């Protein structure tokens, strides 16, 4: 039974909570000195869609912008760009992974681009659900995160868009940066060529989180290592044309040795090579064209026995190759009319070679025996994908800005042809207040790399289709104080069936676990209200406060089931204090309702020999709930300025008051005579983790 595609009474109640806040917020302005009006923006720079958050040195053209230098002073772990985004309303993730969820949607429903190229699963240590992103945070100069309602420029994703841009230092002189922390080292160098017409940058990282784990006494069975390197060279062909060449290589290895369990050895690599042409032939016409090649390789091997009895032998080798051409252009037809159009064509091939031998206990005719399961799958799917769009931004005489758009996407591998109409609108109510709204449909075809071959899948599913409904209000209360209110609803049909480990997500052999469950929702719905209040300053005290009331659920067999990262209530408080240009202190407190989880019980099965076997029974998916989560992170940053260099040191305390937060429970049977009870032990997230980092720039 699908969710009804209408505004539900609960959504109406959410609106009744939020809307009365607006006049109170606006009334507060009368007690403030009116801030100066912002400089006039060109129509192409105006933010029309709601649900847009930015990080960059440029402010004013992106709502709720945070500068890169400010982001660098906030508490963080691993200097990871994906982990840093968890502070944005609507974004959720646990301590172990960088793969954040957006308004109840998994990270695979997010489109990520770096300098114009689409990234595919851009994470290190995928056996730990992607512990870190393959992008070096200091290299990112600007980003936009669109948590919903994005325009027709973006296709083949149903939830969100993340645009990341790198840039060169303001100084044209060569520059070098070296960084060292407990978990890794990094280096970057920027130079120039062809006089002042060409610039290049090389960055490299090598991580050894296993050493940090040893120092913390956490785990002596994990041996993770990762590395990545990126290169960019820009050449100014003329004042109106710039050509850039880019390369990104990332790899990681993981060895897991557990006593009385099989050993895992995995190796992942990602390679991207692309060229980008950016053109501004005149003041009215602008565009870019990107030609890219990508290859992802997976080599995952496991061998041994559980309890020295149940054998396991696993070989999982995969490869994905893509060639893509994308071209987007915008034309200013008049000061009040902007036309954008473009296309993207992709050819992709993939390979799956999967072999499994697994022994399990089974009871047959009252006898406990060992049954062997085997799998031997070899697939070579391939296909082409094509998308095109057209959108027009119109400014009416009454200051209302409309952006209707239409998108078409074709995927030969799945046979999908999807037409997606979209509409965004922005109405400046005053120099300080803007009302925004968006509606549209969004289709996402299953990627060739997304087949769950270990679970027996050999055919791709049809495209998912989501409908977004969003309304938002942004108001500047004072020169450095702003308020944002948003209400959203996302309805999804043709939801793709998937396999979840509903009890323990973090298992190095997920496909053989008893909690591996096929979930085939008939529909899905996410809705909520978000409030963001922030005060930003270059000096002194700045802060941010946000609250989100949300619900994300799926319809399974006629029952509404919460999504795996459903967070009913989320609160985040952040504060920074710049004592002077040398010292900066920051704190971040995060709270959210406990995530859904799945309970386990045991039953006793009598055997012919008079003994009993404790059979594990996995309960309904996500029918239970974990305790609430909260933690405090702290960071202190100190800078030393020298004649030709700068040294920056930082000290972080992750989970400063050592809160025990849970990711789930480990279950075991306790047998007493003819009865069995279920014992559960908490599985913790990260404890108090101190870390130190040093960066030298010269």
Regions found by a protein language model. Give the residues of each.
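Periplasmic N-terminal accessory/gating domains of Gram-negative outer-membrane beta-barrel systems
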Residues: 45-150, 161-168, 184, 530
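Short strand-turn segments of transmembrane beta-barrel domains in outer membranes
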Residues: 130-133, 141-151, 158-191, 200-206, ...
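Transmembrane beta-barrel wall of Gram-negative outer-membrane proteins
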Residues: 181-206, 219-253, 265-293, 333-337
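Membrane-embedded beta-barrel scaffold of Gram-negative outer-membrane proteins
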Residues: 288-292, 296-298, 428, 463-521, ...
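Structural signature of Gram-negative outer-membrane beta-barrels, strongest in the C-terminal barrel
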Residues: 320, 330-338, 344, 376-493, ...
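Surface-exposed extracellular loop regions of Gram-negative outer-membrane beta-barrel proteins
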Residues: 354-356, 363, 427, 431-470, ...
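Gram-negative outer-membrane beta-barrel transporters
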Residues: 396-399, 491, 513-599
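C-terminal beta-signal and adjacent terminal beta-strands/loops
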Residues: 582, 590-612, 627-631, 637-698
């Amino acid at each position: 039974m699908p969710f009804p595609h209408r505004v539900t009474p609960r959504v109406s109640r959410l609106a009744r909570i939020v809307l009365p806040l607006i006049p109170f917020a606006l009334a507060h302005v009368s007690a403030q000195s009116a801030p100066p009006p912002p400089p006039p923006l060109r129509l192409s720079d105006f933010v029309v869609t709601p649900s847009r958050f930015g990080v960059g040195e440029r402010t004013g053209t992106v709502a709720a912008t945070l500068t890169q230098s400010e982001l660098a002073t906030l508490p963080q772990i691993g200097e990871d760009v994906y982990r840093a985004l968890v502070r944005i309303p609507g974004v959720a993730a646990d301590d172990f992974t960088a793969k954040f969820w957006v308004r109840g949607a998994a990270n695979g429903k997010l489109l990520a681009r770096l300098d114009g190229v689409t990234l595919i699963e851009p994470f290190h240590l995928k056996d730990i659900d992607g512990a870190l992103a393959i992008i070096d945070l200091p290299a990112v100069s600007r980003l936009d995160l669109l948590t919903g309602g994005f325009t027709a420029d973006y296709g083949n994703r149903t939830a969100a868009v993340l645009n990341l841009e790198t840039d060169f230092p303001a100084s044209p002189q060569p520059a070098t940066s070296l960084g060292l922390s407990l978990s890794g080292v990094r280096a970057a160098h920027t130079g120039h060529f062809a006089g002042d017409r060409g610039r290049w940058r090389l960055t490299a990282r090598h991580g050894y989180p296993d050493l940090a784990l040893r120092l913390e006494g956490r785990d002596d069975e994990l041996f993770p290592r990762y590395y990545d390197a990126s290169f960019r060279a820009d050449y100014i062909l003329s004042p109106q044309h710039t050509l850039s060449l880019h390369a990104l290589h990332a790899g990681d290895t993981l060895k897991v040795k557990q006593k009385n369990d099989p050993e895992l050895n995995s190796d992942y690599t990602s390679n991207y090579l692309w060229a980008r042409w950016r053109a501004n032939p005149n003041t009215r016409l602008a565009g870019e064209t990107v030609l890219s090649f990508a290859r992802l390789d997976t080599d995952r091997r496991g061998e041994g026995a559980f309890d020295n009895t149940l054998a396991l032998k696993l070989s999982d080798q995969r490869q994905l190759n893509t060639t893509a051409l994308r071209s987007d252009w915008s034309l200013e037809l008049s000061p009040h009319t902007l036309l954008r159009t473009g296309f993207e064509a992709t050819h992709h091939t993939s390979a799956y070679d999967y072999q499994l031998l697994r022994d399990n206990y089974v009871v047959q005719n009252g006898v406990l025996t060992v049954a062997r399961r085997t799998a031997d799958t070899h697939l070579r799917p391939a296909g082409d994908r094509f998308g095109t769009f057209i959108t027009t931004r119109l400014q009416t005489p009454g200051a209302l800005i409309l952006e209707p758009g239409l998108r078409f996407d074709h995927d030969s591998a799945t046979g999908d042809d999807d037409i997606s109409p979209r509409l965004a609108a922005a109405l400046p109510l005053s120099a300080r207040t803007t009302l925004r709204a968006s509606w549209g449909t969004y289709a996402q075809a299953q990627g060739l790399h997304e087949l769950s071959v270990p679970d027996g899948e050999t055919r791709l599913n049809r495209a998912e289709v989501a409908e977004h409904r969003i309304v938002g209000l942004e108001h500047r209360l004072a020169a450095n104080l702003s308020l944002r209110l948003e209400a959203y609803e996302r309805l999804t049909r043709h939801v793709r069936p998937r396999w979840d480990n509903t009890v323990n997500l973090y298992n190095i052999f997920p496909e053989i676990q008893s909690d591996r469950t096929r979930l085939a929702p008939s529909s899905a719905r996410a809705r909520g209200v978000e409030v963001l209040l922030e005060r930003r300053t270059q000096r002194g005290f700045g802060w941010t406060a946000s609250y989100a009331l949300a619900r994300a659920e799926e319809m399974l067999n006629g029952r509404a089931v919460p999504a795996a990262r459903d967070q009913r209530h989320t609160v985040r408080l952040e504060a920074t204090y710049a004592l002077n240009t040398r010292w900066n202190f920051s704190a971040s407190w995060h709270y959210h309702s406990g995530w859904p989880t799945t309970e386990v019980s045991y039953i006793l099965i009598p055997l012919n020999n008079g003994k009993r076997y404790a059979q594990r029974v996995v309960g309904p998916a996500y029918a239970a709930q974990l305790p609430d989560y909260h933690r405090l992170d702290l960071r202190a940053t100190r800078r030393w300025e020298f004649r030709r260099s700068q040294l920056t040191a930082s000290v972080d305390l992750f989970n400063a008051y050592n809160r025990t937060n849970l990711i789930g429970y480990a279950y075991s049977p306790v047998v007493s005579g003819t009865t069995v009870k279920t014992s559960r032990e908490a599985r913790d997230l990260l404890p108090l983790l101190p870390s130190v980092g040093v960066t030298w720039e010269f």
